[in-house]
Amino acid sequence: MCPISTALFVIAAILALIYVFLTWNFSYWKKRGIPTAKSWPFVGSFPSVFTQKRNVVYDIDEIYEQYKNTDSIVGVFQTRIPQLMVTTPEYAHKIYVSDFRSFHDNEMAKFTDSKTDPILANNPFVLTGEAWKERRAEVTPGLSANRVKAAYPVSLRVCKKFVEYIRRQSLMAPAQGLNAKDLCLCYTTEVISDCVLGISAQSFTDNPTPMVGMTKRVFEQSFGFIFYTVVANLWPPITKFYSVSLFAKDVAAFFYDLMQKCIQVRRESPAAQQRDDFLNYMLQLQEKKGLNAAELTSHTMTFLTDGFETTAQVLTHTLLFLARNPKEQMKLREEIGTAELTFEQISELPFTEACIHETLRIFSPVLAARKVVTEPCELTNKNGVSVKLRPGDVVIIPVNALHHDPQYYEEPQSFKPERFLNINGGAKKYRDQGLFFGFGDGPRICPGMRFSLTQIKAALVEIVRNFDIKVNPKTRKDNEIDDTYFMPALKGGVWLDFVERN
């Protein structure tokens, strides 16, 4: 055999071995009598992870649409790893709530190393088992109704500054309008840094602190992290000796340094120690529980990073939908009135809260939940075929698909806040049916939900009271989700015009 033929034979043999390695497990679900979504070598059932032509949630949505009427469970593959997707709200509720013990953890924990990425590793969303349970018990009292109420005057003060900032920016606004996400991120950075740390990020000035820029980078799409999760699925042992951080090193270092300085200032200031805020609560917890500096910093950093981005996204999209729907904007304006609202009054704004919940339905912070099986259990398909799941298996809940299924939500792409009014059962009705997961559900429901809702409502009250919000032509008319960002966001950005009201 000539050298060229030998080389071609070797290459062909190597390619064949790679193909077998990538696809040999694709019969996993078929052998167990479970229907399987179409899968491809290397990319599994979700090719958009690699093509980046659209958000991967649309791959999940298509699988859901294909099987929802015939099957309650369907086999999928994350690269070459078999996973199971549920297609019924009953199973979604079972996994989140009624059988929580069997689906206790989130898949993200598999790809997170506490040494490489201590911020993410200490996030309640990522923590597992008893560590999560202990952390949840520690953090929840720091977000009590009394502490949220104590922070409300700070929120009002920041909201007044926010309105003035929008007013100044509108005077200088180009024809493309204002970037609503940037505006809202300035607000959440300012209000959360003040409420939590007692400092100002100077977000509404011409010379903001570096905190504003770093906040914008917190959840930038990290291709390195995505690629690492793909490799880890192809070859799981890599997680034992190599890991990649979701957060850029300089971003993590900045916030760690900021936290250390804030803690030092707080300890040295008797007056600041009287604030009933999250940082003082954490300092008290440190003394009580003996937390080390790294744990204290990570605890508080988690609250900051989650609050900055998630709250800003929800506020951005709520403003978008109010701008698209002038009648709903007018209803909200009528509800809030003209007088300054107390904490008790802002907590009782049913239509405003319904607008936020409807926004969370359309742009849910978690588009698909990936839960890790923690106790042996069994799921049964519509045809009666059951499959036994073992600890370590992953089950996917297609949150975005359930939120947009016309079987459960009439005209799912339309903004209809009345769905979530208490007279119609409110958000609780949909949660109990396994159809709404805006803040998650069950024991792992977002612990900062009350705080986040208060900050969003406070901002909406001041903005809607002072401006008519209009959609700038630069903003797309549909709800397509961006494929380049870690958090769900409208593709192309949200560009709005704020017209001063008399």
UniProtKB/Swiss-Prot annotation:
Pfam families cross-referenced by the UniProt entry: p450
In terms of PROSITE patterns, this protein maps to: CYTOCHROME_P450 (PS00086)
Q: Which CDD domains match?
A: CYP6-like
Molecular functions per Gene Ontology: heme binding; iron ion binding; monooxygenase activity; oxidoreductase activity, acting on paired donors, with incorporation or reduction of molecular oxygen
Instruction: Give the record's keywords alphabetically.
Output: Endoplasmic reticulum, Heme, Iron, Membrane, Metal-binding, Microsome, Monooxygenase, Oxidoreductase
Q: Where does heme bind?
A: C446
User: What sort of enzyme, by top EC class, is this?
Assistant: oxidoreductase
At the top level, the lineage of the source is Eukaryota
This entry carries the following GO cellular component terms, namely: endoplasmic reticulum membrane
Database matches in InterPro entries: Cyt_P450 (IPR001128), Cyt_P450_CS (IPR017972), Cyt_P450_E_grp-I (IPR002401), Cyt_P450_sf (IPR036396), Insect_CytP450_Detox (IPR050476)
Q: Which cell locations does it reside in?
A: Endoplasmic reticulum membrane; Microsome membrane
- Protein topology in the membrane: Peripheral membrane protein
- Name the Gene3D superfamilies for this protein: Cytochrome P450
E.C. number(s) listed in UniProt: 1.14.-.-
Q: What does this protein do?
A: May be involved in the metabolism of insect hormones and in the breakdown of synthetic insecticides.
Q: What is this protein called?
A: Probable cytochrome P450 28d1
* The species this protein was found in: Drosophila melanogaster (Fruit fly)
Name of the encoding gene? Cyp28d1
